A protein has these predicted regions:
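Residue-level detector of solvent-exposed, low-hydrophobicity positions
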Residues: 12-15, 44, 118, 126-128
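Pocket-edge structural micro-motifs
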Residues: 18, 32-34, 57-58, 111
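Cap/insert and terminal regions of metallo-dependent hydrolase folds
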Residues: 49-134
Length: 134
């Protein structure tokens, strides 16, 4: 809740990010992507032994949003659940591809069911899918 966040900030235990932050922690960077599914989205880049992977969060949920489909091989932004104009989402998609130098195999999308074929994974006790990308 907002009151708790205010208390944490006053106590010096909360740092608010504004824009891109390279090496927030060693090997972890945060990138702002603007509007999309919600306001002022952020993505996290993690440097692993297998290279850098970008978790797109809600900036791009599914591969077909970014890559299109066989019938429609172009960006398919989901504007039904978006904030702001579709152009902002398309610009965000451009940024995503720029950050991974076009290598979509280094993207982790929140609702990407194809990850099961790419990374080892297991179900947690709570029924969550845990993927190992390192």
């Amino acid at each position: 809740d907002v009151e708790r966040l205010e208390k944490l900030e006053k106590a010096g235990r909360l740092t608010l990010l504004d824009g891109d932050v390279e090496d927030l922690f060693p090997g972890i960077s945060v990138y702002s992507v603007g509007f999309g599914h919600s306001f002022d989205l952020q993505m996290v880049m993690v440097d692993t032994e297998k290279g850098k992977f970008l978790h797109t969060g809600d900036a791009c949920n599914r591969p077909e949003n970014l890559l299109g489909t066989e019938s429609f091989p172009f960006y398919l932004p989901n504007t039904d659940f978006a904030v702001g104009p579709a152009l902002n989402i398309v610009r965000g998609f451009d940024r995503i591809l720029e950050l991974v130098h076009g290598d979509v195999t280094h993207l982790i999308m929140t609702h990407d069911d194809t990850r099961r074929d790419l990374f080892p994974w297991h179900k947690s006790e709570l029924g969550l899918s845990i993927f190992e990308i390192c």
